[in-house]
Amino acid sequence: MTDISERNKLILEAIIEDYITTAEPVGSRAVTKRHGLTLSPATVRNVMADLEEMGYLVSPHTSAGRVPTDKAYRLYVDSLLAVRRIDKVERERIRKRYAEAGRDIGAVLHETSRLLSSVSHYTGIVLAPRFSATIFRHIEFVKLGGRRILVILVADNGTVQNRLIESDEEFSSEELIRMSNYLNELLVGVPVGQVRTRILEEMRNEKVLYDKLLARALQLSEQSLNDDGAQIFIEGQTNILEQPEFADSRRMRDLFRAFEEKNQLVGLLDRCLNAQGVQIFIGAETHLSQMEGLSIITSTYLTGKNTLGVLGVIGPTRMGYAKVIPIVDYTAKLVSRLLEGE
């Protein structure tokens, strides 16, 4: 950014930090008084007018003060922000929460969304690992009523998915056990994304052609793996509704719609899967119209070098970036260690 002088950056930083704290449009007198600048209010006023012309500030109709734009927050995050470390007490509090969550991956991820919400005071969000990105460990068919079968799928990272399927014919419990044993022997250690290929290869096997039960086992397993819908955990939506900029009913409605239409959020989080480290989307950068006025800070969590999913915090564009960025970063690293069994 070469279009803004150091003095103007200093004043813009002061305005942004005041607005983050107060949620009120910031005037020139407040900037000089709160930040001890050796500049007159008139000089600051002129700078604010310049910053508005450059697209960093806007003037609400009802106020003489100014409000930062998405462009201002982007400059703030990229160039002006001093990110602080999480203090020892906060780190211990986060680790203790995970100790209470146990080792079940679903419980860990659900607790992560709650923790991110409670520590940041905004909304915590976690995209669970896609089953197709894991390694197959175990499948079990459980007979329910009629032709309904509960399929329990287990991945090498501990992810468990339960799926209900309707079979074309009825099987006994003994037949389902034999089918499960056959598939477990065939598929253990195979990447889930390659399971269908392995199944199609096996269907050409002469043994399968003459064993109807094995053929049906392969068909059932393919049916079971057909749905790889994303699982997303969201906690603390009401924290955003308590922010003054979301007080009017239209903004509130849009916000609820954004959280209800999870496919759009999943699409945004999917974009983060190929990026390492913390990602920050400010306002319009999310490309989600219903998330106007919101920012999202995310980071991937991993096992080894394999990206499993994404976690993060959604808050107003005036969120406390200096506090939230290290929380998201630390939590992602801690979740990665937990899932690796450290």
Swiss-Prot record:
Key word Repressor present: yes
Key words of the record: Repressor, Stress response, Transcription, Transcription regulation
Record-linked Pfam families: HrcA (PF01628), HrcA_DNA-bdg (PF03444)
Record-level Gene Ontology MF annotations: DNA binding
A GO biological process held by the record: negative regulation of DNA-templated transcription
Highest rank taxon of the organism: Bacteria
Cited InterPro entries: GAF-like_dom_sf, HrcA, HrcA_C, WH-like_DNA-bd_sf, WH_DNA-bd_sf, WHTH_HrcA_DNA-bd, WHTH_transcript_rep_HrcA_IDD
NCBIfam families xref list: hrcA
UniProt similarity note: Belongs to the HrcA family.
Protein's job: Negative regulator of class I heat shock genes (grpE-dnaK-dnaJ and groELS operons). Prevents heat-shock induction of these operons.
Protein name per its UniProtKB record: Heat-inducible transcription repressor HrcA
Organism: Geobacter sulfurreducens (strain ATCC 51573 / DSM 12127 / PCA)
